[in-house]
Amino acid sequence: MLFLRRIAVVFFVFTSFSAAQNSTCPLDFSVLEPFRRPKPDGATTCQYLLQGLRLLYSHHLRQTGSFLPPPESAASCWAALQSSVAGFLPRFDVRSTCGFQTPWISQGCMDITTRSQFESLIPNSSLATTAMRCNTSLESNTPCASCTQSLSAFQPYLSGPSLGNVSDCASFPSIYAAAFANSLGPTDKGTAKCLFQLDLASPTSSGANKVKVLVSSFSVLLVASVLVITAWFWYCRRKKSKLLKPRDTSLEAGTQSRLDSMSESTTLVKFSFDEIKKATNNFSRHNIIGRGGYGNVFKGALPDGTQVAFKRFKNCSAGGDANFAHEVEVIASIRHVNLLALRGYCTATTPYEGHQRIIVCDLVSNGSLHDHLFGDLEAQLAWPLRQRIALGMARGLAYLHYGAQPSIIHRDIKASNILLDERFEAKVADFGLAKFNPEGMTHMSTRVAGTMGYVAPEYALYGQLTEKSDVYSFGVVLLELLSRRKAIVTDEEGQPVSVADWAWSLVREGQTLDVVEDGMPEKGPPEVLEKYVLIAVLCSHPQLHARPTMDQVVKMLESNEFTVIAIPQRPIPLVACREEIDRSVSSSSGSGKLTSPTGYQAFSFGGDGPSGNTNTT
């Protein structure tokens, strides 16, 4: 009898263990079926899966009160996701293509797993504001903008490190709001579009319906043609009558925007020129907080007392308003804790000031990184703050490259475009030079724009722009942050020297830590400082193929292992010889390895990152 009892106990333990190992996934993947599927390319599909998983988390949270599936179900959840993708992309491997790791699907922000844990971190006033602003249909622009703006108040309380890129701290507010602040739930059309950038798919048509569509289309085309002809005759007559009347140049008429509205997907607020004049005290010089080649930046206050920044562009013409409108619309749709939020815009023609083009952004309290490194501020930044700024810059740029749709290449990353909030969280700003990367292209030729010392060699020489052009600029800014030396300085002989060449000369001689500013407060461990220097040198390598991607940079900076990607030998200083650059532009792999006093090993990534057998320098 005792023997049988022992067998029963062993059998129970074994079956329980097996059940835990093969726990079914609690996420309901059928929820994603009504939503439009992506085009068959890696970047778009990965973004769809990322946002789709977040919508599933929200649906799961609404049903169970838990944000994430249990860790023991991670494998089955990935298998279920793979099965759902196989229906429209049969050869697409979710984890290997998108870089997802198995545990990430059950890991989130600051170990938060339940609704009560999340709400305990956020002030009741912020939760109440979100419940009020988000509890409506979010299909149109105004309620969506109001809802997402209220969610930004959650971010200061969700600043912990994220273990993966599936459900990070930046995404938790949207997951929570869709589940509980909005009574319609995450699967509602407006909620999914506003908070997860997912559109419902159009219903499929049968053969008979297609015929009806063709007939209807022809009828609409015929009617439209008649209307166009009628409108043309009306326009000609109206234009002729206007020539016989004196021009009306009143201020009210002049301040009308050339663009009356934006598209349905934008969350921008359109300000009148008079509103902005009032907010900036008629563009008073005392309100100027920044100057640049594209115009001045003014501080001001909105009617509700909110402090904002107004960037006023120079030398504008109404003819460029369409491109301007498209650019700000795309920028406004990109939301991340390390990107400066765009609140609104203004386009107007006035009788005295001429054509105006202005964007309205959040005002940050600690100025720019340039102010703290090279401005009048005397206090040195301590290492913990510099480390936070470096990580924030990297995460913001990585999101522009791989989280935004379409991906955005900034083109003008520099210290003055890295703004710092009250917690010294970095905000990547100034998208005036942003260039949108067309799907399927590895590079594009464009008019070179940027700032001396920060522009990548292949871009400066040939105008060929890729995400790795931004990586180069990031490396230069990171070196400035570590050394407190400007991008371009003069040596003892009065010759210009780039900070990248100066840093490389020290690293090559085994003096890596000499790059770090003397007397830095709260200086970190030598091995950590050395890792950051080597990452900066790698990013600012003159050869394109040698640089990592921003995703790889984030992983290296966040890693507790003191490893770094292999660094190839650099060619001649500042800008490599044209033959080397030519080869670099058309190449996607390189080799080389850097030894260091603390004994770094090569940190290799799959994909397009540099790796392989190396030559020690």
Curated annotation (Swiss-Prot):
Reaction equation(s) it catalyzes: L-seryl-[protein] + ATP = O-phospho-L-seryl-[protein] + ADP + H(+); L-threonyl-[protein] + ATP = O-phospho-L-threonyl-[protein] + ADP + H(+)
Residue numbers annotated as active site: D412 (proton acceptor)
Sequence ranges on the Cytoplasmic membrane side: 234-617
Q: How does it sit in the membrane?
A: Single-pass type I membrane protein
Where do the segments described as Disordered lie? Answer: 585-617
Question: Which UniProt keywords are listed?
Answer: ATP-binding, Cell membrane, Glycoprotein, Kinase, Membrane, Nucleotide-binding, Receptor, Serine/threonine-protein kinase, Signal, Transferase, Transmembrane, Transmembrane helix
TM annotation in the entry:
213-233
| EC number annotated for this UniProt entry | 2.7.11.1
- Subcellular localization(s) per the UniProt record: Cell membrane
Name used for this protein in its record: Probable LRR receptor-like serine/threonine-protein kinase RKF3
Give the originating organism: Arabidopsis thaliana (Mouse-ear cress)
Q: What is the lineage of its organism?
A: Eukaryota, Viridiplantae, Streptophyta, Embryophyta, Tracheophyta
Q: Which gene encodes it?
A: RKF3
